[in-house]
Amino acid sequence: MAAEEGKEEPGLDQVEEEFSVWKRNTPFLYDLMISHPLEWPSLTLHWVPSTPIPYAKDPSFSVHKLILGTHTSGSAQDFLMVADVVIPTPDAEPGLGGRDQDPIVPKVEIKQKIRVDGEVNRAQCMPQKPTLVGTKTSGSEVFLFDYARLSAKPQTSECDPDLRLMGHEDEGYGLAWSSFKEGYLLSGSQDRKICLWDVSATANDKVLNPMHVYEGHQSIIEDVAWHMKNENIFGSAGDDCQLVIWDLRTNQMQHQVKVHEREINYLSFNPFNEWVLATASSDSTVALFDLRKLTAPLHVLSRHEGEVFQVEWDPNHETVLASSGEDRRLMVWDINRVGDEQLEIELDAEDGPPELLFSHGGHKAKISDFAWNKDEPWVISSVAEDNSLQVWQMAESIYREDDEDHDEEGNQNAQHSNENQK
């Protein structure tokens, strides 16, 4: 994920000007916008997969939980953090930040800090036991913490995980729990290895070795992901530009294909369609593939200016996905709109391809991570290197379609205002 050599970075004045334009347009672009400053930037962000609870002070709001981490660069103690996010329920009156007449506004509150050794690169909750968090840091070990057993503030000066998962020789970012096989955790790192653990297995002195180590990549492994329909299939991607599909039943590669000319930073399997997956690459594109024919992409999404570091399918809409990159933009795409005719006016062409639904420009630095909220459709959280945490939902008028066809004029005006932030 190295920065592209010779690429000119935008100046501070340009960044501030773009942010100012975005901020002025915020009331027109969003139905929800929470911006929360963090003490330290977080490289990771994950919605806890548990049922939201009603907010005690007002049942028209609900409380969701987020997992975050700190990235202090050695300047201070690092922590894994659990936050409460208070947002309006779908039945609450729409409006920026909830109902204007209500004294309760959406907010983020850090509720728990867990001491870790090293900066938190990636943290993911186990689907079958959401309080159990797999944590990759700047060290080679993967930690498991059950935050339900820990107090809100650290009671010890040492890192005390429930399990230490061994097998790697270097740090990394790839981490994925199986939604089918309880306790199965994948990890990919800079040592070119993929480790698989069954954390329900008996450990000796809270240390667990992998049940299998997969090797085949020729460079750093950037990401690993489980197939969303087949419990035995997972994928990996890395700096060797290779997309690899693995099968647990044989512990062998099923496919190994060079699908980009530059590093692949992320992959995501579609949660609805068993054949479709997406990759994010340093070549500035997001590519869509059919598992039955990986030699050529189904479609390439091009709008980012610079490396693309992440891509995630929307868990609530089959044709919607989002991507983020070094251009400080988080873009939402609807591939159902690929091939739609654009209005033949200059503004429409400036807005990008018809499948580009929305471009979020609320961060002043590279976006480190983002996550869709499965319980609240169209709600996304994102964190960036400028210490900002944002929870947001684009205006309904942007994604809503009329029964017969798109509301072309409304969508065009909203998207044009949205793109003015660029």
Model-derived features: where do they sit?
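Structural core positions within WD40/WD-like beta-propeller blades
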Residues: 67, 133-134, 185-186, 235, ...
